[in-house]
Amino acid sequence: MDIRDLHTDAVALLPGHTTEQGASRRTALQAVLGLGYAAAAMPIMAQTAVTTDAKGLKEGWVTVPSNGFDVPAYVARPAAKKNPPVVLVVQEIFGVHAYIQDVCRRLAHAGYLAIAPELYARQGKASDYTEIAKLQAELVSKVPDEQVLQDLDATLTWAAKAGGNVRKAAITGFCWGGRVTWLYAATGRVKAGVAWYGRLEGQASANTPSHPLAQVTQLKAPVLGLYGGQDTGIPMASVARMQEALAHGSKAAQASEFVVYPDAPHAFHADYRASYREAAAKDGWQRLLQWLRSHGVA
């Protein structure tokens, strides 16, 4: 993704854009310039962060072989369920941290083998960065879409060997991963996708030659887009352009839907941030589960 798009995304997800919970513009600026993931979490984390236990689950870290590289991945699955359907979980820009792992456990409790590969692993570790600007410039912008899609293919291959039912596979992703969700829904490897506030259009680059808006004619799985009406990084005009394109796209594109939460900012599902909006997050989660069931991923 072009570094300008990444900067816009980072500013949108910071707590400085959530003034009613006490975060100021100064806080946001500090976070962009140097406080990284810790700044995105802020003290609000202790108040709202959801912790899902692993009772009845098998969970932990595994390695996924992909083009000669072992990609670390966090996986959670029901301990007693054979051949569970598979959900690929795609990270935010911060990598597969505690929140993304918790999302996997939530999906596992719903009956899925949920797996989140570290899609930056070849380029470095997101956890090594304390500054969002450096994280964007030195890591995130260096990750090619082609590599990401191939690693997701390899993750499905691993899941199949581990007993997952990849004939009933879906993908969901947040922010950076929301964009990836749209792209992967065009590959034919999944039956459905749920994209949480993923960028829909932007500057093309060598590593990100195309964006979701340009791929609606290639979409092979219907996607549910969950977006915030107050997202400063993804204007509603962009959502409207995507909706118009979907209406004239492939069969899967025409079956895709958007839900916009008028008062929600970017990252409204991220319960460890000040951007968290409980009502929108819970409603979106129920819509995710229903979307998967209604498209045969259950």
What is the predicted role of each segment?
Residues 252-298:
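C-terminal catalytic histidine-bearing segment of alpha/beta-hydrolase fold enzymes
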Residues 22-27, 37-51:
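N-terminal twin-arginine translocation
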Residues 219, 225-227:
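Short beta-strand/loop motif that positions the catalytic acidic residue
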Residues 1-23:
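N-terminal secretory signal peptides
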